[in-house]
Curated annotation (Swiss-Prot):
Induction and repression of expression: By testosterone.
Domain of life, source organism: Eukaryota
Family label: Belongs to the SVP2/SVP5/SVP6 family.
Source organism of the structure: Rattus norvegicus
Name of the gene: Svs5
UniProt entry keywords in alphabetical sequence: Secreted, Signal
Residue ranges of the region described as Disordered: 50-123
Subcellular location: Secreted, Extracellular space
Tissue specificity as recorded in UniProt: Testis.
Compositionally biased region (Low complexity): 64-75
Bias-annotated ranges (Basic and acidic residues): 77-87
Protein name: Seminal vesicle secretory protein 5
InterPro entries: Svs4/5/6
Gene Ontology cellular-component terms listed: extracellular space
Length: 123
């Protein structure tokens, strides 16, 4: 058995034993805490036995992003955030895709805040 096959089999075994060890009450309480858990259906489609392409195909429910609504109140005001030029970023932060940003509030300059830029693509 190849090391990749052994690793995938071990991960599958851990996932199955964790799912079997949960009781029905714990599953219910988890779904009550996370309202989006029922919309996030992640399925593994096995395309070949023992091959590395076993975990290659995933499908996600179509309505998971379309049903998303922000729970934050509309009265919260957000400060404008200006993105600094790329030349002012350090080489280590640009290596990891980090952007340095500065917020202006009330005429005073706040310390720089590092935020990770993530992209969400829709299918």
């Amino acid at each position: 058995m190849s090391p990749t096959g052994f690793f995938l089999l071990t991960v599958l075994l851990v996932l199955v034993t964790e799912a079997a060890s949960r009781g029905p009450r714990e599953k219910f309480s988890q779904s009550a805490e996370d309202p989006y858990s029922e919309n996030m259906n992640l399925k593994i489609l096995a395309s070949g036995r023992g091959s590395s392409s076993t975990f290659g195909a995933f499908s996600r429910s179509e309505n998971s992003r379309s049903n998303f609504k922000s729970k934050s109140p509309s009265s919260i005001t957000r400060e404008k955030v200006n993105e600094e030029s790329r030349s002012e970023m350090s080489s280590t932060s640009s290596h990891f895709g980090l952007k340095m940003r500065r917020s202006h509030g009330g005429g005073e300059m706040n310390p720089f805040e590092t935020k990770v830029k993530t992209r969400i693509t829709r299918k």
